[in-house]
């Protein structure tokens, strides 16, 4: 058989094999087109599980008459126009294959009208060459797509359709997922003339939990823990069910969205599972509805024809970000609720001291009996989030640090307790082990401090470097190694390989685990402070540093790594500065007594005061 160009209909039917798997696939593609058109109301009519009829009606922007024929052509789209658009996709559709593929395996009719047109127009394709016919029609502003007799001309595909009930259940699940992605859109679903689902739009700032409960059920809503987590261009929002109360029915609720696009991503599922693993049994699964917002340039959605999968350019960063966000919410859930007056109070637990940088040490003062006020939880501030806790040699430090930081942001009203004995020393005696109180942030990377009436400036990047060095320096036990989701494989020279082998024991104490072969080294684990770094740059530089050394001391290597790590904060906030100083005072108390050069600089206000008095 000679090589020849396939007829348009046959080519579209081949493409339909990838895009149109079943009626639910058609519904997904058409509803996503409606959302891209800016629709705020979408009505979906299904007959016989979608095999007989699929009708999607929306109130979007519509399609111009001159573009109707192109809309049914293959590789025709208004979503992208250049490679730059493809590398930063913000729409749900972009391939321009859906309508052409669907029309090749069904009888598709497209009716649309724009606000500028006086009348609507209808288009349909037929014949071997998929010629498009356009004629006038009556229709309001928006678009209606009718798909009749799906797979009528491909009997083999039609045989694989399941029962009417099964196919409609798949459609219902797709609509549930879309309704969770777009709370601002009204969606109505009917089957065989009966309305089955009605999801009303939720106004901006409205009660999204109402739609969440309607879709996921009250059982999930009762156990749902809200997530609001942000770091740079990454934002994680949504809900995760309390793992301690997860049931097999709840475990079926696993909805994840990346930039509003529903996904089935193993990396995201792994991060969530890892965060919940201490609270889930071997046969249990977490339940969640999560929304990940990321810079479109950092994610590739052009992976699968049905757009079910994505690839992240910095997969380790995304994995750890999601893991830490879910873990922080679960740790907050472990906090003991405020007891009522008539309830027996549990024995006090050991809580690290509230550091002076956040204000006066109220925990060192006697409690005053006052009426119990309702607990107030401040709304999460946009553009900032609690700093991710670092581990250290002290067991359970992550939880303690998270608890202290949350207490700095939200202090419950004093409890009614018997009057405590007077403290043996002044309440602010902790000043001797503190840098002081953070007043404000100066030039985005310096903290203005006040201690005993004296003012000083502290360089936050320098303090961060000392903290990292302390975190990386092994104590009585080696630094805990964190396995990489995707090991890093690098090509090395003979000299570099020899240096790595000599430094292997020292690197192991720092939590860096690797395996070498003839010409390559594979980094399998790193300490937690390195997980947020660009290892493809840092590790080769570290190998180059080791190749120039003759003695390999863990302390020297930790110092070099700390000096070469990139700062997590381009601009520091008050909360981040307070958390950093709390960590430095805990792990590096010697810096408070004898600050090294470049860390702390006193500010002399006497000239300014004198100038004011002389005026």
UniProtKB/Swiss-Prot annotation:
Domain of life: Bacteria
Coiled coil: none
GO CC annotation terms, alphabetical: mismatch repair complex
SMART domains for the chain: DNA_mis_repair, MutL_C
Renumbered residue ranges of the record's region Disordered: 369-397
GO MF entries: ATP binding; ATP hydrolysis activity; ATP-dependent DNA damage sensor activity; mismatched DNA binding
Disulfide pairings: none
GO terms for biological process, alphabetical: mismatch repair
Regions of compositional bias (Low complexity) in chain numbering: 378-391
Gene3D superfamilies: 3.30.230.10, Histidine kinase-like ATPase, C-terminal domain, MutL, C-terminal domain, dimerisation subdomain, MutL, C-terminal domain, regulatory subdomain
Keywords: DNA damage, DNA repair
PANTHER family in alphabetical order: DNA MISMATCH REPAIR PROTEIN MLH, PMS, MUTL, DNA MISMATCH REPAIR PROTEIN MLH1
Family the entry assigns: Belongs to the DNA mismatch repair MutL/HexB family.
Role: This protein is involved in the repair of mismatches in DNA. It is required for dam-dependent methyl-directed DNA mismatch repair. May act as a 'molecular matchmaker', a protein that promotes the formation of a stable complex between two or more DNA-binding proteins in an ATP-dependent manner without itself being part of a final effector complex.
Protein name: DNA mismatch repair protein MutL
Organism field: Escherichia coli (strain SMS-3-5 / SECEC)
